[in-house]
Amino acid sequence: MSNENESNNLSLSDDLNAVESTGSSKDSDVIIESAASDDSSTSEANYVPEQDNLEKMILSTGIRVGTPVKTKYMVPFIIRANPEGLYILDISKTLSRIDIAAKFISRADISKVAVTSAREYGKTPVEKFCDLTHAKYILGRFMPGTFTNPALPKYMEPQIVIVTDPQADQQAVLEATRAGVPVIAICNSDNVTSKVDLVIPANNRGRKALATVYWLLAREVLKKQGVIKTDSEMKIPIEDFETKLVEEFS
């Protein structure tokens, strides 16, 4: 049974149930070694030689490295703890959830998809994702009432809300829930996901990890929108999604 909010959109529920019943996303084009395997090996069943460098680079970003704390909500997405005591997230579930999210986003009016990040390291990834897909970004402090108070100048009625961290972006999550809008969230091992409709398990604190999640999500959305047809047509490197350290202090 999923930990996600059961009041989510029917089509999102169907996509999620289809993946969880099979254990993987049938249409996912992202091939990465199983998180349960050793880092130096790849799954023989899914191994694609030309993707080897990309796979290693993605894993090197720390995308699956969680925190020393786990919540009951995130237990299904954790495979083990490493020697440093950090919980390791299941990369196969990360990728399948990115695929589900991309399918759902591609069926929406992209101009009504709101993406938020209160976290500094999430700002550039979110902005780049929105530039490519034409979703709307909300960076920094989320103004209370943005989704619930029509009198506000920046009021909007999103069809989908994507948050970088359900804790840091809790006001956006709360208002989306009140408005009956599905919430997609990047969730670390210590997050509470009771108000999240679709969890994307991943490191949501790391600069490179967040860039990687949003790059993968952007690529899959563009493919499902028909903007690009293959992975190789995604010419923008992951590095372009990273928040540069100089930006933080400028």
Predicted regions and their residues:
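A charged, well-structured terminal subsegment
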Residues: 211-237, 241-244
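Electropositive, gly/pro-rich neighborhoods at or near active sites that engage anionic ligands
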Residues: 64-66, 88-92, 104-107
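Glycine-rich phosphate/diphosphate-binding loops that line cofactor/substrate pockets in enzymes
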Residues: 98-111
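Intrinsically disordered, compositionally biased charged tails
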Residues: 1-50, 232-250
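P-loop/Walker A NTP-binding module and the surrounding RecA-like catalytic core of P-loop NTPases
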Residues: 115-117, 186
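Glycine-rich phosphate-binding "P-loop"
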Residues: 78-98, 133
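Short, compositionally biased "basic patch" segments
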Residues: 48-84, 118-127
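Long, charge-patterned amphipathic alpha-helical coiled-coil/hairpin "stalk" segments used as oligomerization
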Residues: 122, 127-210, 217-219, 225
